[in-house]
């Protein structure tokens, strides 16, 4: 159960990764909110949503925000960083408050905690680890810190890839979700992560599905891709409030 307390919720997620056999954490922030609003938006990682063009992607992203299963959690924008999108996302979500936390749960002032505890928690869980992220990820670097059982690569612009290959990808997700039980799936695929988590949850909720965003970029892509990766930044010291 989430309490909308920045540090406390972080450790609750870690506890569930170890102790639960069924949990999803899907995170919606400004990028996802702008897609839902049908605004053209993209980012440095190479994904781009075009207004009125990628409406299939938008529809699937919206549906992925409506789950009310008791073990399905959503992280959304906080009031201290983005109150307009906090309010907007709350107006769409149907699940209860106990299933809501911060989209920033792994970043900002919690990032040092993530660095210290997250990979250790994965190792301590002794569960199979499956990573879904960009195809150029350096899986060997991550493997040196935690054993990765499987890798689902995402090529190019995730928005276009999903729309052009939707049925094939659904088949692939069905295969992967049904191959594992009580495994931990880590997603770092932009706003597509939320769709993938929802699709796999519907196939097999007896796994752990977590959107980790850019947190492992220093390992996976050998770069500090976000400001919070640098400990001297303003964001690295921000303790988010609900």
Where are these regions (language model features)?
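Electropositive, gly/pro-rich neighborhoods at or near active sites that engage anionic ligands
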Residues: 1-145
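C-terminal functional extensions of proteins
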Residues: 188, 192-242
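A short, acidic, amphipathic alpha-helical segment used as a generic capping/interface helix at domain edges
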Residues: 8-12, 56-63, 164-177, 193-194
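A mid-sequence, solvent-exposed acidic-amphipathic segment
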Residues: 143, 147-183
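Residues at the C-termini of beta-strands that transition into short coil/loop
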Residues: 78, 152-155, 213
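A polyampholytic, Gly/Pro-enriched intrinsically disordered region
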Residues: 122-123, 130, 169-177, 228-242
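Structural motif
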Residues: 128, 183-184
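Residue-level detector of flexible, active-site-proximal loop/helix-junction positions
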Residues: 81, 156-158, 216
